[in-house]
Amino acid sequence: MKIIVFSAPSGTGKSSVIRELLKQTDLNLAFSISTTSRAPRGSERDGVEYYFVSAEKFQEKVKQGAFIEWQEVYAGNYYGTYSSEIDRLSALGKNIVFDLDVFGGINLKKHFGDKALAIFLQPPSLEELKKRLEHRQTDTPEKIAMRIDKAAYEIEQATHFDKIVVNDNLQVCVEEVAQLIRSFLNH
């Protein structure tokens, strides 16, 4: 079992890249479902994209030591990875894919060391990222401004990752990342 960690600013296309990679059966990937205290967006379902819990329940699980990593990503919105989720996917003999915020990604890379490939997906520019976030129509202008400010900071952290890939074109990005993963899995 190997670990592939993806981190990126919100709106970079991380979920789309991961969705395409999971279709490539030769990579033997399984998606680690994170737990969050935020409300579901759009068509998100509990146990598919995330495990949705209250902030109180999340804090209870933190105190119980249930998470291998966790962060308060936005005020009052917690994200984390249950240790039991890694055990579940490991038992299936899969390579595990994580979709984490920047600090969660850095922490997981430190935890797993050479067993993990940490990939930072970067938008072509902050202007393009703003357009993508506006097109998504899930956030207020204030929330988009907050996400752009956070993205600038996250991009500064990219050097902590093994590889940085710019997502300017989904198919090109997916192929580039698939090659990185194949190379990692074969070593």
Language model region names:
Residues 7-9:
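P-loop (Walker A) phosphate-binding loop of NTP-binding proteins
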Residues 18-19:
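Post-Walker A alpha-helix
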Residues 15:
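Walker A/P-loop
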Residues 23-31:
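Post-Walker A helix-loop "phosphate-sensing" segment adjacent to the P-loop in P-loop NTPases
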Residues 12:
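ATP-binding Walker
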Residues 131, 135-139, 153-187:
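NTP-dependent small-molecule kinase module
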